[in-house]
Every structure is written in C-alpha cells, then in structure tokens.
C-alpha cells in the first residue's frame, strides 16, 4: 500500500484516500501519488483512456477545526473532479486564518504541472525574487477580467502587471 512519508494519518475508504501531511511535503506527496497511480493503472486503461486520479489538498491554519479542514479537502477534491476538463486533476484549497479561501486547479498532464509551478513560486517568494503582492494583483486581474478576456490577452495583462514589479525579467516570463 502507498503511504506518504511523514503522514500523520492515512485512511482508505472505497477509492478515496485521506492523508494528513506536513505542508512542506504535501505537494510532493500528491505528485508522487499521481505518478505512482499512473504507472500502476496504465495496464487497465481502455481505448486509450487511462483511469484518472483527482486529488483535493487543503492547506489550513493549525488552529482550524479538523472538521472544517476535512470539509475544505472534500470541496477541493470535488473541484478537482468537476472542473473543466473533468477529472485527473489536483485542486489546492488554501484557507487563511482570516480572509477568503483560495482555490487553484490543474490537471496532472499539464506542462508544466501545477505542482511544479506552485513549488517554483514558493521558492521565488522565499528567495525574495517575486514580490508577495504580485499574487494579489494577479488574482484581482483574474477576478475582474478572467472570463471577459481571451487567454492571450489575459496572459499579456499578467505580464504587464509583473513588468511593473522589481524582479528579474526571467522570473516575470516564467
């Protein structure tokens, strides 16, 4: 059986798995689970369709009631399954101690994958290479114009916002 390294608890029910993990290992554990699932299930695919894995990951404050954390994880898993395109995705839900929840979703077959993008962003934040306010400005852009603008225009506006920030050009384009 698969058990993530450092998991405080791991339970299975039907085809659902629940693991409690330290924040610094959760994304890598989710990626490792997806890779292992893909390898193990590859022989069982039909007509070029492999079985899918949808993962909901909840990041909560340590004082958050466990039931609330579990509810958030279930909502994240549901969005991973039901977002477009459906299934085979990771949804990370973040609930700060105060403020609104944030959700981000990406499919396992995206390039670069969501896990890599989030880990890279965290590295850049820790190194002070990306201003922390940049994420809030990009979130505001998506909320205000996300549906109204075509993808290319949205990316161009995001690059314009990042272009105003004091950061190396390579990080802006990443």
Task: List the model feature ranges, each with a label.
Residues 1-174:
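Charged, helix-rich terminal subdomains or tails
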């Amino acid at each position: 059986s698969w058990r993530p390294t450092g998991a405080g608890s791991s339970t299975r029910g039907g085809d659902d798995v629940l693991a409690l993990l330290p924040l610094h290992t959760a994304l890598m554990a989710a990626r490792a689970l997806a890779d292992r699932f893909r390898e193990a299930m590859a022989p069982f695919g039909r007509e070029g369709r492999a079985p899918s894995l949808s993962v909901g990951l909840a990041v909560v404050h340590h004082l958050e009631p466990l039931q609330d954390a579990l509810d958030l994880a279930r909502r994240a898993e549901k969005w991973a399954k039901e977002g477009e395109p459906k299934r085979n995705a990771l949804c990370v839900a973040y609930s700060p101690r105060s403020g609104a929840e944030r959700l981000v979703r990406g499919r396992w077959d995206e390039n670069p994958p969501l896990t890599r993008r989030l880990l890279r962003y965290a590295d850049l934040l820790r190194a002070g290479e990306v201003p922390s306010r940049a994420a809030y400005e990009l979130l505001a852009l998506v909320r205000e114009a996300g549906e109204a603008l075509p993808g290319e225009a949205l990316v161009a506006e995001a690059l314009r916002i990042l272009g105003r920030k004091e950061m190396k050009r390579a990080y802006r384009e990443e």
